[in-house]
Amino acid sequence: MATIAVTDSVREVRNQAPPLQPIDLFAVDLALREALEREGGGWGVARAHEAGAAAGSAAALHHSRRAERNEPILHTHDRYGNRIDEVELDPSWHWLLRGAIERGIHGSPWREPRDGAHPVRAALFMLWSNANAGVMCPVSMTYAVVPALRHSAPEIAADWEPRLTGLDYGAGALAGMAMTERQGGSDVRAIITRAEPAGEGWYELNGHKWFCSYPPCDVFLVLAQAPAGLSCFFVERGPGMEFQRLKDKLGTRSLASSEVELRGVRARLVGEEGRGVPAIIRMVNHTRLDCLIGSASAMRRATVEALHHARHRSAFGEPLIEQPAMRNVLADLAIESEAATVAALRVAHSYDGGEPAFQRFATAVMKYWVCKRAPSLVGEALECLGGNGFVEESAMPLIYRDAPLNSIWEGSGNVAALDVLRAIVSEPAGLTAFLAECELAAGSDTRLDAHLARARETTAAVLVGEDGRTVQERRYETQFRARRIVEDLALALQASLLVRHAPGAVADAFCSARLGGDAGHAYGTLPAGVDARTIIGRALPV
């Protein structure tokens, strides 16, 4: 009998974008590749390609989805009633975290201190964040604890650094931090956890912490009130750390974040009594850098998803990527993402040494701005995919839920902006170094020149206003404008970097839209004359 072929048009799949994976996320990111070379990290290109291919693999996508679906479970007691405080984690979480540790993202600059060490790590951090943002929290804290210990507790650093920076996932150690309490949030002065001397250099901590991310960490830096005031302590996970519950969070659901009670926990002092904030701030500055890098990563991944979809999807008889309105949106996303990437790598390079004033100031400025821009960009990118981007099989819902976190972690928007204002007054060398970096592009674009002039005037007014009143007398007015002051500084650095290093089409579009006042408030309102085709082709080469 002859076989009759039956065609079922209902089941035929047409006009759908093919899977993005497998993809080498580093190979298709020209902005990151160029920035890595420029910032001294050319020696790490092979590592970045390997990480980019692994993060862009079908396996990474599978493990990320599984880790998000099978959320951590806290077991406070065993079957007999003994306190155990263990967190059950899906094997896919371990696959993702192991991938970050074995690539050295948690400590490579400390293992290999050389020029470009931090840019190489930043590139690897950006790429592996594409696999899963949740695992990057313990990775970031472990990286950040080392400089804090080296500076304020060198004897502890000597004991723990080999494990904190080692590449063996099973034998290594992870670090966390616990500052926030339920009554205080970002206001560490409100901390009520007590630290009482217990002899021979030990203290006992009693109190609670409202947020403690990643309870399986081996060690933690904890803030508590000692006899001489707020102090920083080194705590090894063990008896007395009683985890109460895991947070039911909007995003990073693969990451275990907890509430913990401290009941006679043994701890060692880091730094001096009463100097807790200066001791822990070195850790905070490095995790703030990772907030910046992580947000740049989310922006890039969302932009790639939008570009890939638009390149393969047609509507009204024409590919989306060829339609003028969509092309405007995609080009706008691309320039915003590239600006975030180049800023993240430039700031990361300052951590290699020799630029302490620029490093501290630029970290605060760019952490505020890039983390603030990420959620809106991701939302716009999701819209490019339409309904396909709104379903959980897409990568977009996960990126969207995770996007707001970095703007909250290590100080929300107002905290970050006010930190910049304080730095302008207390550490003016930081502002000077920051503006000097921006002015390396002076004379190259009239819009940037005008913007820099305004930024100089605005920041000068923070110190002494036109009416001659002092900083304290003008405190309300200055704080009221805090976000705009910091925004102008951030845009100045991004524009300067693009004018100096990006193709003319990218730099011109950015300066026109972000500095020249020629664009609207929504993405996709770039002015006429922008070379969108060139920008899009650069953002995701065919």
Summary of predicted features, one role per range:
Residues G240-G264:
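Flexible, small-/acidic-enriched active-site or ligand-binding loops
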Residues E437-V542:
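C-terminal amphipathic alpha-helical interaction region
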Residues D78-G172, C212-Y214, S337, D402, ...:
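Internal helix-loop-helix
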Residues E338-K367, L382-E383, A460-F480, V486, ...:
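C-terminal helix-coil-helix/basic helical segment that borders enzyme active sites and/or dimer interfaces
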Residues E259-T287, V304-I321, P428, H451-R475:
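A glycine-rich, basic-preceded beta-loop-alpha segment at the flavin cofactor/substrate interface
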